[in-house]
Amino acid sequence: MCTGGDSNFQTLAYSRHSVRDFSDKPLSVEQVKKAVKLAQTAPSACNRQSSRIIHVTDREKCEKILNIQGGAKGHSITELLLLVSDLSLYRFLSEMDTPYLDSGIFLMNLLYSCTYYGIDTCPLIWDDYGEKGTELRRILPIGKNMHVIAVIQIGERRENSVHAISHRRPFEDVFVEI
């Protein structure tokens, strides 16, 4: 068990950055599977485990998906992970936000798991409503009960590439004690 004095998680968390410049080297499928398996340790409401991962390695399909997504301009095309949530596991109106909460927790765990296994990532926002969802389903066999939450570019960063330094809000702006 990790304890407060164990800096391994702290080192991992501070070392994770979004990467946008990937090498052409394909990842090992086993490496990706290990990261997803570790991400499955994420908690979920009532242990529903609604998150699913679709690993897309076909470069042509990746390019089409990123064109639909629209925000990955200037990124090198790599492999993608699509995080989807099985909406059939949620039956009540009061649970309508739960797939996003569960998937958000899973996504963060996935990003850390990828970092742990040496896979660089760049999470991208996805709007699964309207035309984008329809276009995506023409490319990939995604069931109607599956809601796309995020697209994650994965790969190995290009040698000598740099990543943006994203400054964090001051701690005092984030933490309130009452």
Q: Which residues fall in each region the model found?
A:
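Acidic, surface-exposed loops and disordered segments
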Residues: 1-178
